[in-house]
Amino acid sequence: MRLKRFLLRYFPPGIILEYEKGGELKTKAIDLLELSPTTDVDLVVEEIQKAEPLITASRTQQVKQLILRLQEKIGQQDSRQFYLFKVLRAHILPLTNVAFNKSGSSFITGSYDRTCKVWDTASGEELHTLEGHRNVVYAIQFNNPYGDKIATGSFDKTCKLWSAETGKCYHTFRGHTAEIVCLAFNPQSTLIATGSMDTTAKLWDIQSGEEALTLSGHAAEIISLSFNTTGDRLITGSFDHTVSVWEIPSGRRIHTLIGHRGEISSAQFNWDCSLIATASMDKSCKLWDSLNGKCVATLTGHEDEVLDVTFDSTGQLVATASADGTARVYSASSRKCLAKLEGHEGEISKICFNAQGNRILTASSDKTSRLWNPHTGECLQVLKGHTDEIFSCAFNYEGNTIITGSKDNTCRIWR
Amino acid sequence: MGLLSILRKLKSAPDQEVRILLLGLDNAGKTTLLKQLASEDISHITPTQGFNIKSVQSQGFKLNVWDIGGQRKIRPYWRNYFENTDVLIYVIDSADRKRFEETGQELAELLDEEKLSGVPVLIFANKQDLLTAAPASEIAEGLNLHTIRDRVWQIQSCSALTGEGVQDGMNWVCKNVNAKKK
Protein backbone atom coordinates (compact mmCIF):
# COMPACT_ATOMS: atom_id res chain seq x y z
CA MET A 1 0.00 0.00 0.00
CA ARG A 2 1.37 3.35 -0.98
CA LEU A 3 -0.17 6.73 -0.27
CA LYS A 4 -0.43 8.79 -3.46
CA ARG A 5 -2.07 11.99 -2.33
CA PHE A 6 -4.46 13.72 0.04
CA LEU A 7 -7.82 15.20 -0.87
CA LEU A 8 -9.61 17.58 1.42
CA ARG A 9 -13.33 17.42 2.08
CA TYR A 10 -14.67 20.52 3.79
CA PHE A 11 -18.22 19.42 4.63
CA PRO A 12 -18.50 17.25 6.51
CA PRO A 13 -14.82 17.74 7.43
CA GLY A 14 -12.56 14.91 6.40
CA ILE A 15 -9.35 13.90 4.67
CA ILE A 16 -9.54 11.50 1.74
CA LEU A 17 -6.52 9.29 1.17
CA GLU A 18 -5.77 8.22 -2.35
CA TYR A 19 -3.50 5.18 -2.30
CA GLU A 20 -2.23 2.34 -4.42
CA LYS A 21 -2.82 -1.27 -3.54
CA GLY A 22 -1.80 -4.11 -5.84
CA GLY A 23 -1.54 -1.70 -8.76
CA GLU A 24 -5.03 -0.36 -8.16
CA LEU A 25 -5.89 3.18 -7.17
CA LYS A 26 -8.15 3.33 -4.12
CA THR A 27 -9.48 5.91 -1.71
CA LYS A 28 -10.53 5.96 1.89
CA ALA A 29 -11.87 8.72 4.06
CA ILE A 30 -10.84 9.85 7.52
CA ASP A 31 -13.94 11.56 8.91
CA LEU A 32 -13.30 14.43 11.31
CA LEU A 33 -16.93 15.09 12.17
CA GLU A 34 -16.27 16.59 15.57
CA LEU A 35 -13.46 18.89 14.49
CA SER A 36 -13.95 22.48 15.64
CA PRO A 37 -11.76 25.60 15.38
CA THR A 38 -10.61 25.04 18.96
CA THR A 39 -9.71 21.34 18.66
CA ASP A 40 -6.06 20.54 19.59
CA VAL A 41 -4.54 19.77 16.18
CA ASP A 42 -1.53 17.80 17.44
CA LEU A 43 -3.85 15.50 19.35
CA VAL A 44 -5.93 14.87 16.23
CA VAL A 45 -2.83 14.14 14.15
CA GLU A 46 -1.58 11.76 16.79
CA GLU A 47 -4.89 9.87 16.83
CA ILE A 48 -4.97 9.65 13.04
CA GLN A 49 -1.43 8.35 12.93
CA LYS A 50 -2.25 5.68 15.50
CA ALA A 51 -5.31 4.48 13.64
CA GLU A 52 -4.14 4.81 10.05
CA PRO A 53 -1.06 2.89 8.83
CA LEU A 54 -0.94 4.96 5.61
CA ILE A 55 -0.07 8.04 7.66
CA THR A 56 3.60 7.55 8.47
CA ALA A 57 5.71 9.89 10.57
CA SER A 58 6.97 11.69 7.48
CA ARG A 59 3.40 12.61 6.55
CA THR A 60 2.30 14.09 9.85
CA GLN A 61 3.34 17.65 9.05
CA GLN A 62 1.27 17.52 5.87
CA VAL A 63 -1.75 16.15 7.73
CA LYS A 64 -1.43 18.91 10.30
CA GLN A 65 -1.53 21.53 7.56
CA LEU A 66 -4.69 19.95 6.14
CA ILE A 67 -6.41 19.95 9.51
CA LEU A 68 -5.48 23.58 10.07
CA ARG A 69 -7.00 24.37 6.69
CA LEU A 70 -10.21 22.54 7.67
CA GLN A 71 -10.33 24.41 10.97
CA GLU A 72 -9.97 27.69 9.15
CA LYS A 73 -12.83 26.75 6.83
CA ILE A 74 -15.09 25.59 9.67
CA GLY A 75 -14.37 28.73 11.66
CA GLN A 76 -15.32 31.11 8.85
CA GLN A 77 -18.13 33.38 9.91
CA ASP A 78 -20.67 34.33 7.32
CA SER A 79 -23.10 37.12 8.01
CA ARG A 80 -24.30 37.28 4.43
CA GLN A 81 -27.70 38.76 3.66
CA PHE A 82 -29.43 37.16 0.69
CA TYR A 83 -31.23 39.20 -1.93
CA LEU A 84 -33.62 38.10 -4.66
CA PHE A 85 -31.38 37.56 -7.69
CA LYS A 86 -33.91 36.22 -10.17
CA VAL A 87 -37.50 35.13 -10.57
CA LEU A 88 -37.72 32.25 -12.99
CA ARG A 89 -41.18 32.12 -14.51
CA ALA A 90 -40.17 28.62 -15.05
CA HIS A 91 -43.29 26.62 -15.44
CA ILE A 92 -46.91 27.18 -16.39
CA LEU A 93 -48.12 25.21 -13.38
CA PRO A 94 -46.97 24.84 -9.74
CA LEU A 95 -43.49 23.57 -8.98
CA THR A 96 -42.90 20.46 -6.94
CA ASN A 97 -39.29 19.89 -5.90
CA VAL A 98 -35.97 21.60 -6.59
CA ALA A 99 -32.39 20.27 -6.35
CA PHE A 100 -28.81 21.43 -6.90
CA ASN A 101 -25.93 19.46 -8.34
CA LYS A 102 -22.94 19.05 -6.03
CA SER A 103 -20.97 22.06 -7.23
CA GLY A 104 -24.09 24.18 -7.37
CA SER A 105 -23.38 25.20 -10.96
CA SER A 106 -26.83 24.06 -12.02
CA PHE A 107 -30.13 23.08 -10.49
CA ILE A 108 -33.39 21.42 -11.51
CA THR A 109 -37.08 22.16 -10.96
CA GLY A 110 -39.99 19.72 -11.29
CA SER A 111 -43.53 20.79 -12.06
CA TYR A 112 -47.19 19.95 -12.46
CA ASP A 113 -46.66 20.95 -16.10
CA ARG A 114 -45.02 17.51 -16.56
CA THR A 115 -41.54 18.85 -17.23
CA CYS A 116 -38.29 19.12 -15.35
CA LYS A 117 -36.09 22.08 -16.22
CA VAL A 118 -32.33 22.37 -15.88
CA TRP A 119 -30.99 25.83 -14.96
CA ASP A 120 -27.64 27.56 -14.89
CA THR A 121 -27.29 28.94 -11.37
CA ALA A 122 -24.98 31.85 -12.19
CA SER A 123 -27.09 33.34 -14.98
CA GLY A 124 -30.54 31.95 -14.24
CA GLU A 125 -30.72 30.74 -17.86
CA GLU A 126 -32.70 27.68 -18.77
CA LEU A 127 -30.35 24.97 -20.10
CA HIS A 128 -32.77 22.15 -20.89
CA THR A 129 -36.40 21.17 -20.61
CA LEU A 130 -36.77 17.47 -19.90
CA GLU A 131 -40.00 16.51 -21.64
CA GLY A 132 -41.66 13.12 -21.89
CA HIS A 133 -43.53 12.47 -18.67
CA ARG A 134 -47.31 12.24 -18.98
CA ASN A 135 -48.13 13.57 -15.57
CA VAL A 136 -46.71 15.66 -12.72
CA VAL A 137 -42.92 15.48 -12.32
CA TYR A 138 -42.63 15.14 -8.58
CA ALA A 139 -39.33 13.64 -7.39
CA ILE A 140 -36.08 14.88 -8.94
CA GLN A 141 -32.39 14.31 -8.20
CA PHE A 142 -28.91 14.74 -9.62
CA ASN A 143 -26.54 11.78 -9.27
CA ASN A 144 -24.30 13.74 -6.92
CA PRO A 145 -21.37 14.07 -6.51
CA TYR A 146 -20.97 13.37 -10.25
CA GLY A 147 -23.85 15.51 -11.46
CA ASP A 148 -23.86 14.23 -15.03
CA LYS A 149 -27.25 12.52 -14.73
CA ILE A 150 -30.73 13.46 -13.56
CA ALA A 151 -33.53 11.16 -12.44
CA THR A 152 -37.19 12.21 -12.49
CA GLY A 153 -40.07 10.37 -10.85
CA SER A 154 -43.59 11.12 -12.01
CA PHE A 155 -47.24 10.65 -11.17
CA ASP A 156 -47.31 8.84 -14.55
CA LYS A 157 -45.79 5.88 -12.61
CA THR A 158 -42.47 5.99 -14.50
CA CYS A 159 -39.00 7.17 -13.65
CA LYS A 160 -36.73 8.61 -16.32
CA LEU A 161 -32.96 8.91 -16.42
CA TRP A 162 -31.52 11.89 -18.35
CA SER A 163 -28.18 13.31 -19.33
CA ALA A 164 -27.65 16.52 -17.35
CA GLU A 165 -25.41 17.82 -20.13
CA THR A 166 -27.53 17.20 -23.22
CA GLY A 167 -31.02 16.70 -21.75
CA LYS A 168 -31.31 13.41 -23.61
CA CYS A 169 -33.40 10.65 -21.99
CA TYR A 170 -31.33 7.47 -21.46
CA HIS A 171 -33.97 5.20 -19.95
CA THR A 172 -37.61 5.09 -18.91
CA PHE A 173 -38.12 2.77 -15.97
CA ARG A 174 -41.57 1.15 -16.01
CA GLY A 175 -43.01 -1.18 -13.41
CA HIS A 176 -44.61 0.81 -10.62
CA THR A 177 -48.39 0.66 -10.59
CA ALA A 178 -48.95 4.06 -8.92
CA GLU A 179 -47.35 7.51 -8.63
CA ILE A 180 -43.60 7.71 -7.97
CA VAL A 181 -43.10 10.21 -5.18
CA CYS A 182 -39.51 9.78 -3.99
CA LEU A 183 -36.22 8.66 -5.48
CA ALA A 184 -32.48 8.57 -4.84
CA PHE A 185 -29.26 7.61 -6.59
CA ASN A 186 -26.93 5.37 -4.62
CA PRO A 187 -23.63 7.17 -3.85
CA GLN A 188 -21.79 5.12 -6.49
CA SER A 189 -24.34 6.23 -9.09
CA THR A 190 -24.97 2.69 -10.30
CA LEU A 191 -28.54 2.38 -9.01
CA ILE A 192 -31.67 4.48 -8.68
CA ALA A 193 -34.19 3.72 -5.95
CA THR A 194 -37.80 4.82 -6.44
CA GLY A 195 -40.61 4.85 -3.89
CA SER A 196 -44.23 4.73 -4.94
CA MET A 197 -47.80 5.10 -3.81
CA ASP A 198 -48.11 1.43 -4.89
CA THR A 199 -46.42 0.59 -1.51
CA THR A 200 -43.22 -0.75 -3.09
CA ALA A 201 -39.77 0.59 -3.73
CA LYS A 202 -37.78 -0.49 -6.75
CA LEU A 203 -34.11 -0.46 -7.64
CA TRP A 204 -33.11 0.18 -11.22
CA ASP A 205 -29.78 -0.51 -12.88
CA ILE A 206 -28.52 2.68 -14.48
CA GLN A 207 -26.28 0.94 -16.98
CA SER A 208 -28.73 -1.62 -18.33
CA GLY A 209 -31.94 0.31 -17.72
CA GLU A 210 -33.46 -2.81 -16.17
CA GLU A 211 -35.30 -3.30 -12.91
CA ALA A 212 -32.86 -4.79 -10.39
CA LEU A 213 -35.13 -5.40 -7.40
CA THR A 214 -38.56 -4.78 -5.95
CA LEU A 215 -38.71 -4.09 -2.22
CA SER A 216 -42.12 -5.21 -0.97
CA GLY A 217 -43.34 -5.30 2.58
CA HIS A 218 -44.91 -1.96 3.39
CA ALA A 219 -48.64 -1.95 3.93
CA ALA A 220 -49.13 1.59 2.62
CA GLU A 221 -47.60 4.25 0.36
CA ILE A 222 -43.83 4.87 0.47
CA ILE A 223 -43.22 8.61 0.58
CA SER A 224 -39.58 8.94 1.61
CA LEU A 225 -36.40 7.03 0.89
CA SER A 226 -32.69 7.52 1.24
CA PHE A 227 -29.40 5.67 0.99
CA ASN A 228 -26.75 5.75 3.66
CA THR A 229 -23.35 7.30 2.91
CA THR A 230 -21.75 4.05 1.79
CA GLY A 231 -24.70 2.84 -0.26
CA ASP A 232 -25.18 -0.56 1.39
CA ARG A 233 -28.42 0.43 3.16
CA LEU A 234 -31.65 2.01 1.97
CA ILE A 235 -34.42 3.25 4.24
CA THR A 236 -38.04 3.67 3.18
CA GLY A 237 -40.62 5.66 5.14
CA SER A 238 -44.27 4.81 4.70
CA PHE A 239 -47.79 5.95 5.46
CA ASP A 240 -48.08 2.56 7.26
CA HIS A 241 -46.33 4.29 10.24
CA THR A 242 -43.10 2.28 9.82
CA VAL A 243 -39.66 2.66 8.29
CA SER A 244 -37.86 -0.30 6.72
CA VAL A 245 -34.11 -0.74 6.51
CA TRP A 246 -33.01 -2.73 3.45
CA GLU A 247 -29.66 -4.26 2.70
CA ILE A 248 -28.33 -3.30 -0.71
CA PRO A 249 -27.82 -4.93 -3.15
CA SER A 250 -29.46 -8.09 -1.72
CA GLY A 251 -32.77 -6.35 -1.03
CA ARG A 252 -33.15 -8.16 2.27
CA ARG A 253 -35.17 -6.26 4.87
CA ILE A 254 -33.01 -6.19 7.98
CA HIS A 255 -35.07 -3.98 10.27
CA THR A 256 -38.53 -2.53 10.53
CA LEU A 257 -38.61 0.54 12.72
CA ILE A 258 -41.90 0.29 14.58
CA GLY A 259 -43.04 2.84 17.14
CA HIS A 260 -44.58 5.86 15.44
CA ARG A 261 -48.32 6.23 15.82
CA GLY A 262 -48.91 8.16 12.64
CA GLU A 263 -47.77 8.25 9.02
CA ILE A 264 -44.05 8.78 8.39
CA SER A 265 -43.22 12.01 6.59
CA SER A 266 -39.45 11.68 6.24
CA ALA A 267 -36.58 9.33 7.13
CA GLN A 268 -32.86 10.18 7.00
CA PHE A 269 -29.46 8.70 7.90
CA ASN A 270 -26.77 10.73 9.57
CA TRP A 271 -23.38 10.93 7.85
CA ASP A 272 -21.66 8.09 9.69
CA CYS A 273 -24.78 5.91 9.23
CA SER A 274 -25.09 5.19 12.95
CA LEU A 275 -28.45 6.91 13.39
CA ILE A 276 -31.72 7.18 11.52
CA ALA A 277 -34.08 10.10 12.16
CA THR A 278 -37.77 9.72 11.34
CA ALA A 279 -40.50 12.36 11.31
CA SER A 280 -44.13 11.49 11.77
CA MET A 281 -47.67 12.82 11.71
CA ASP A 282 -47.84 11.66 15.34
CA LYS A 283 -46.14 15.03 16.18
CA SER A 284 -42.84 13.42 17.12
CA CYS A 285 -39.48 12.64 15.63
CA LYS A 286 -37.58 9.50 16.60
CA LEU A 287 -33.92 8.54 16.50
CA TRP A 288 -33.02 4.91 15.88
CA ASP A 289 -29.82 2.93 16.17
CA SER A 290 -29.29 1.84 12.57
CA LEU A 291 -27.36 -1.30 13.56
CA ASN A 292 -30.01 -2.92 15.73
CA GLY A 293 -33.11 -1.01 14.64
CA LYS A 294 -33.98 0.05 18.19
CA CYS A 295 -35.50 3.43 18.99
CA VAL A 296 -33.01 5.40 21.06
CA ALA A 297 -34.92 8.65 21.51
CA THR A 298 -38.26 10.32 20.87
CA LEU A 299 -37.95 14.03 20.21
CA THR A 300 -41.13 15.71 21.36
CA GLY A 301 -42.32 19.28 21.65
CA HIS A 302 -44.14 19.94 18.40
CA GLU A 303 -47.84 20.59 18.74
CA ASP A 304 -48.79 19.31 15.31
CA GLU A 305 -47.57 16.91 12.62
CA VAL A 306 -43.82 16.82 11.94
CA LEU A 307 -43.48 17.24 8.18
CA ASP A 308 -39.73 17.05 7.62
CA VAL A 309 -36.52 16.11 9.40
CA THR A 310 -32.87 16.54 8.50
CA PHE A 311 -29.40 16.09 9.99
CA ASP A 312 -26.66 18.65 9.53
CA SER A 313 -23.77 17.39 7.40
CA THR A 314 -21.76 16.11 10.38
CA GLY A 315 -24.75 14.45 12.03
CA GLN A 316 -24.49 16.39 15.28
CA LEU A 317 -27.75 18.30 14.90
CA VAL A 318 -31.26 17.21 13.97
CA ALA A 319 -33.78 19.78 12.71
CA THR A 320 -37.53 19.21 12.46
CA ALA A 321 -40.26 21.16 10.66
CA SER A 322 -43.86 21.06 11.73
CA ALA A 323 -47.41 21.93 10.77
CA ASP A 324 -47.49 23.91 14.04
CA GLY A 325 -45.49 26.62 12.23
CA THR A 326 -42.29 26.09 14.19
CA ALA A 327 -39.05 24.26 13.59
CA ARG A 328 -36.83 22.77 16.26
CA VAL A 329 -33.17 21.90 16.55
CA TYR A 330 -32.07 18.99 18.72
CA SER A 331 -28.66 17.63 19.66
CA ALA A 332 -28.20 14.18 18.15
CA SER A 333 -26.12 13.08 21.11
CA SER A 334 -27.91 14.60 24.12
CA ARG A 335 -31.34 14.53 22.34
CA LYS A 336 -32.12 17.85 23.99
CA CYS A 337 -33.98 20.59 22.15
CA LEU A 338 -31.37 23.30 21.55
CA ALA A 339 -33.49 25.87 19.79
CA LYS A 340 -37.04 26.60 18.75
CA LEU A 341 -37.43 28.49 15.47
CA GLU A 342 -40.52 30.66 15.75
CA GLY A 343 -41.88 33.21 13.32
CA HIS A 344 -43.57 31.50 10.39
CA GLU A 345 -47.27 32.19 10.02
CA GLY A 346 -48.15 28.87 8.46
CA GLU A 347 -46.99 25.28 8.45
CA ILE A 348 -43.37 24.54 7.61
CA SER A 349 -43.11 21.75 5.08
CA LYS A 350 -39.36 21.67 4.30
CA ILE A 351 -36.22 22.21 6.31
CA CYS A 352 -32.51 21.99 5.41
CA PHE A 353 -29.09 22.94 6.71
CA ASN A 354 -26.37 24.51 4.62
CA ALA A 355 -23.35 22.20 4.24
CA GLN A 356 -21.45 24.30 6.78
CA GLY A 357 -24.12 23.60 9.37
CA ASN A 358 -24.37 27.21 10.52
CA ARG A 359 -27.66 28.10 8.79
CA ILE A 360 -31.10 26.51 8.56
CA LEU A 361 -33.53 27.23 5.74
CA THR A 362 -37.27 26.61 6.04
CA ALA A 363 -40.10 26.71 3.49
CA SER A 364 -43.63 27.53 4.55
CA SER A 365 -47.22 27.87 3.43
CA ASP A 366 -47.00 31.51 4.59
CA LYS A 367 -45.27 32.22 1.23
CA THR A 368 -41.90 32.92 2.84
CA SER A 369 -38.66 31.08 3.36
CA ARG A 370 -36.65 31.93 6.43
CA LEU A 371 -33.02 31.69 7.45
CA TRP A 372 -32.13 30.80 10.99
CA ASN A 373 -29.17 30.41 13.29
CA PRO A 374 -29.45 26.75 14.38
CA HIS A 375 -27.70 27.36 17.68
CA THR A 376 -29.60 30.40 18.92
CA GLY A 377 -32.87 29.91 17.05
CA GLU A 378 -32.68 33.50 15.86
CA CYS A 379 -34.40 34.30 12.55
CA LEU A 380 -31.74 35.99 10.45
CA GLN A 381 -33.75 36.77 7.36
CA VAL A 382 -37.20 36.42 5.83
CA LEU A 383 -37.15 35.70 2.09
CA LYS A 384 -40.31 37.38 0.81
CA GLY A 385 -41.68 37.55 -2.70
CA HIS A 386 -43.48 34.36 -3.60
CA THR A 387 -47.21 34.90 -4.07
CA ASP A 388 -48.28 31.42 -2.99
CA GLU A 389 -46.98 28.75 -0.67
CA ILE A 390 -43.42 27.48 -0.98
CA PHE A 391 -43.12 23.75 -1.57
CA SER A 392 -39.35 23.30 -1.70
CA CYS A 393 -36.05 25.00 -0.92
CA ALA A 394 -32.35 24.19 -1.15
CA PHE A 395 -28.89 25.55 -0.43
CA ASN A 396 -25.99 25.03 -2.78
CA TYR A 397 -22.89 23.36 -1.31
CA GLU A 398 -21.10 26.69 -0.89
CA GLY A 399 -24.01 28.00 1.11
CA ASN A 400 -24.11 31.26 -0.85
CA THR A 401 -27.12 30.55 -3.08
CA ILE A 402 -30.67 29.50 -2.22
CA ILE A 403 -33.44 28.34 -4.52
CA THR A 404 -37.13 28.18 -3.64
CA GLY A 405 -39.92 26.48 -5.60
CA SER A 406 -43.51 27.58 -5.17
CA LYS A 407 -47.10 26.84 -5.96
CA ASP A 408 -47.05 30.27 -7.67
CA ASN A 409 -45.36 28.59 -10.70
CA THR A 410 -42.04 30.37 -10.13
CA CYS A 411 -38.64 29.44 -8.85
CA ARG A 412 -36.59 32.14 -7.18
CA ILE A 413 -32.82 32.38 -6.86
CA TRP A 414 -31.50 34.22 -3.80
CA ARG A 415 -27.85 34.99 -3.24
CA MET B 1 -50.81 22.46 2.59
CA GLY B 2 -47.33 21.39 1.44
CA LEU B 3 -46.42 18.64 -0.99
CA LEU B 4 -46.91 15.91 1.59
CA SER B 5 -50.52 16.88 2.23
CA ILE B 6 -51.10 16.75 -1.50
CA LEU B 7 -49.77 13.19 -1.50
CA ARG B 8 -52.11 12.30 1.33
CA LYS B 9 -55.06 13.68 -0.63
CA LEU B 10 -53.92 11.72 -3.67
CA LYS B 11 -54.60 8.38 -2.02
CA SER B 12 -57.81 6.69 -2.92
CA ALA B 13 -60.06 8.11 -0.27
CA PRO B 14 -61.28 6.04 2.67
CA ASP B 15 -65.04 5.44 2.95
CA GLN B 16 -66.00 8.69 4.56
CA GLU B 17 -63.83 10.83 2.29
CA VAL B 18 -64.82 11.96 -1.18
CA ARG B 19 -62.52 13.25 -3.85
CA ILE B 20 -64.24 15.89 -5.95
CA LEU B 21 -62.80 17.39 -9.09
CA LEU B 22 -64.00 20.89 -9.96
CA LEU B 23 -63.53 21.70 -13.65
CA GLY B 24 -64.84 24.17 -16.19
CA LEU B 25 -63.66 26.98 -18.47
CA ASP B 26 -61.72 29.94 -17.10
CA ASN B 27 -63.95 32.50 -15.38
CA ALA B 28 -66.73 29.93 -14.84
CA GLY B 29 -66.54 30.57 -11.10
CA LYS B 30 -64.84 27.41 -9.82
CA THR B 31 -62.68 29.11 -7.22
CA THR B 32 -65.56 31.27 -6.02
CA LEU B 33 -67.63 28.13 -5.65
CA LEU B 34 -64.81 26.42 -3.73
CA LYS B 35 -64.49 29.37 -1.37
CA GLN B 36 -68.26 29.55 -0.98
CA LEU B 37 -68.23 25.87 0.01
CA ALA B 38 -65.50 26.53 2.56
CA SER B 39 -67.30 29.68 3.81
CA GLU B 40 -64.35 31.87 2.90
CA ASP B 41 -64.15 35.45 1.67
CA ILE B 42 -64.93 35.63 -2.06
CA SER B 43 -64.20 39.29 -2.71
CA HIS B 44 -60.68 38.96 -4.14
CA ILE B 45 -60.43 36.03 -6.51
CA THR B 46 -57.86 35.96 -9.29
CA PRO B 47 -57.50 33.48 -12.17
CA THR B 48 -56.18 30.17 -10.87
CA GLN B 49 -52.74 29.46 -12.35
CA GLY B 50 -52.52 26.00 -10.84
CA PHE B 51 -54.94 24.46 -8.40
CA ASN B 52 -56.57 24.92 -5.01
CA ILE B 53 -57.59 22.17 -2.61
CA LYS B 54 -60.01 22.50 0.26
CA SER B 55 -61.65 20.02 2.57
CA VAL B 56 -65.22 20.60 3.74
CA GLN B 57 -67.49 18.53 5.92
CA SER B 58 -70.93 17.71 4.59
CA GLN B 59 -73.48 15.12 5.70
CA GLY B 60 -70.90 12.96 7.43
CA PHE B 61 -68.51 13.12 4.51
CA LYS B 62 -65.17 14.85 4.23
CA LEU B 63 -65.23 16.38 0.78
CA ASN B 64 -61.74 16.98 -0.64
CA VAL B 65 -62.42 19.43 -3.42
CA TRP B 66 -59.77 20.05 -6.10
CA ASP B 67 -60.30 23.29 -8.04
CA ILE B 68 -58.20 23.22 -11.20
CA GLY B 69 -57.38 26.30 -13.31
CA GLY B 70 -59.48 26.52 -16.48
CA GLN B 71 -57.46 28.66 -18.87
CA ARG B 72 -57.08 27.13 -22.29
CA LYS B 73 -53.31 26.62 -22.11
CA ILE B 74 -53.55 24.65 -18.89
CA ARG B 75 -56.63 22.57 -19.75
CA PRO B 76 -54.46 19.78 -21.24
CA TYR B 77 -53.16 19.28 -17.68
CA TRP B 78 -56.60 18.55 -16.22
CA ARG B 79 -55.85 14.87 -16.65
CA ASN B 80 -53.08 15.15 -14.03
CA TYR B 81 -55.90 15.10 -11.52
CA PHE B 82 -58.29 12.41 -12.82
CA GLU B 83 -57.00 9.52 -10.71
CA ASN B 84 -59.31 8.36 -7.88
CA THR B 85 -62.00 10.95 -8.63
CA ASP B 86 -65.32 10.14 -6.93
CA VAL B 87 -67.43 12.97 -8.33
CA LEU B 88 -66.88 15.46 -11.14
CA ILE B 89 -68.37 18.91 -10.76
CA TYR B 90 -68.42 20.89 -13.99
CA VAL B 91 -69.04 24.61 -13.69
CA ILE B 92 -70.54 26.73 -16.48
CA ASP B 93 -70.89 30.51 -16.70
CA SER B 94 -74.58 30.61 -17.66
CA ALA B 95 -74.31 34.22 -18.84
CA ASP B 96 -71.43 33.63 -21.25
CA ARG B 97 -73.50 32.34 -24.16
CA LYS B 98 -70.67 32.89 -26.63
CA ARG B 99 -68.74 30.09 -24.98
CA PHE B 100 -71.49 27.49 -24.60
CA GLU B 101 -70.11 25.57 -27.54
CA GLU B 102 -66.58 25.60 -26.15
CA THR B 103 -67.69 24.51 -22.70
CA GLY B 104 -69.89 21.78 -24.19
CA GLN B 105 -66.94 20.44 -26.13
CA GLU B 106 -64.68 20.36 -23.05
CA LEU B 107 -67.37 18.57 -21.07
CA ALA B 108 -67.89 16.01 -23.83
CA GLU B 109 -64.16 15.30 -23.86
CA LEU B 110 -64.13 14.82 -20.09
CA LEU B 111 -67.01 12.37 -20.28
CA ASP B 112 -65.01 10.38 -22.82
CA GLU B 113 -62.02 10.04 -20.50
CA GLU B 114 -61.42 6.48 -19.45
CA LYS B 115 -60.25 7.46 -15.97
CA LEU B 116 -63.52 9.33 -15.38
CA SER B 117 -65.77 6.65 -16.78
CA GLY B 118 -68.86 6.05 -14.64
CA VAL B 119 -67.98 8.97 -12.34
CA PRO B 120 -71.15 10.90 -11.35
CA VAL B 121 -71.19 14.40 -12.81
CA LEU B 122 -72.87 17.48 -11.40
CA ILE B 123 -73.14 20.45 -13.72
CA PHE B 124 -73.48 23.80 -12.01
CA ALA B 125 -75.25 26.37 -14.18
CA ASN B 126 -73.49 29.18 -12.34
CA LYS B 127 -73.98 32.96 -12.24
CA GLN B 128 -77.77 32.80 -12.04
CA ASP B 129 -77.54 36.11 -10.19
CA LEU B 130 -76.88 37.78 -13.56
CA LEU B 131 -79.91 38.90 -15.54
CA THR B 132 -78.52 37.54 -18.77
CA ALA B 133 -77.98 34.04 -17.39
CA ALA B 134 -79.48 31.20 -19.38
CA PRO B 135 -81.73 28.91 -17.33
CA ALA B 136 -80.46 25.41 -16.50
CA SER B 137 -83.01 23.80 -18.79
CA GLU B 138 -81.73 25.73 -21.78
CA ILE B 139 -78.12 24.77 -21.01
CA ALA B 140 -79.07 21.13 -20.51
CA GLU B 141 -80.69 21.11 -23.90
CA GLY B 142 -77.88 23.02 -25.63
CA LEU B 143 -75.30 20.60 -24.24
CA ASN B 144 -77.40 17.50 -25.03
CA LEU B 145 -77.09 16.35 -21.46
CA HIS B 146 -79.95 13.91 -21.95
CA THR B 147 -77.63 11.81 -24.12
CA ILE B 148 -75.43 10.99 -21.10
CA ARG B 149 -76.30 7.38 -20.29
CA ASP B 150 -73.11 5.91 -18.83
CA ARG B 151 -73.36 7.64 -15.43
CA VAL B 152 -75.67 9.54 -13.13
CA TRP B 153 -75.74 13.25 -13.79
CA GLN B 154 -77.55 16.34 -12.62
CA ILE B 155 -77.71 19.98 -13.60
CA GLN B 156 -78.21 22.51 -10.85
CA SER B 157 -78.62 26.24 -11.27
CA CYS B 158 -76.67 28.24 -8.75
CA SER B 159 -74.89 31.45 -7.89
CA ALA B 160 -71.50 30.88 -6.32
CA LEU B 161 -71.57 34.58 -5.44
CA THR B 162 -74.75 34.49 -3.36
CA GLY B 163 -74.54 30.82 -2.49
CA GLU B 164 -77.98 30.08 -3.87
CA GLY B 165 -78.36 26.53 -5.19
CA VAL B 166 -74.87 25.49 -4.08
CA GLN B 167 -76.06 23.42 -1.14
CA ASP B 168 -78.70 21.70 -3.27
CA GLY B 169 -75.95 20.63 -5.64
CA MET B 170 -73.77 19.34 -2.83
CA ASN B 171 -76.70 17.39 -1.41
CA TRP B 172 -76.99 15.65 -4.76
CA VAL B 173 -73.25 14.93 -4.64
CA CYS B 174 -73.46 13.32 -1.21
CA LYS B 175 -76.47 11.28 -2.18
CA ASN B 176 -74.87 9.95 -5.32
CA VAL B 177 -71.38 9.35 -4.02
CA ASN B 178 -73.04 7.33 -1.33
CA ALA B 179 -74.49 4.97 -3.90
CA LYS B 180 -71.15 4.56 -5.63
CA LYS B 181 -69.02 4.15 -2.51
CA LYS B 182 -71.27 1.40 -1.16
Swiss-Prot record, chain A:
GO terms for biological process: intraciliary transport; outer dynein arm assembly. Keywords: Cell projection, Cilium, Cytoplasm, Cytoskeleton, Flagellum, Repeat, WD repeat. Its main location: cytoplasm. One of its GO terms (cellular component) is ciliary basal body. Pfam families: WD40. Gene3D superfamilies: YVTN repeat-like/Quinoprotein amine dehydrogenase (2.130.10.10). WD repeats lie at residues 90-129, 132-174, 175-214, 217-256, 259-298, 301-340, 343-384, 386-415. It is found in: Cytoplasm, Cytoskeleton, Flagellum basal body; Cytoplasm, Cytoskeleton, Flagellum axoneme. The keyword Cytoplasm applies. InterPro entries: G-protein_beta_WD-40_rep, WD40/YVTN_repeat-like_dom_sf, WD40_repeat_CS, WD40_repeat_dom_sf, WD40_rpt. It comes from the Eukaryota. The keyword Lipid biosynthesis does not apply. SUPFAM superfamilies: WD40 repeat-like. Required for axonemal dynein assembly and ciliary motility in ciliated organs, including Kupffer's vesicle, during embryogenesis. Facilitates the onset of robust cilia motility during development. Belongs to the WD repeat WDR69 family. This is Dynein assembly factor with WD repeat domains 1. The lineage of its organism: Eukaryota, Metazoa, Chordata, Craniata, Vertebrata.
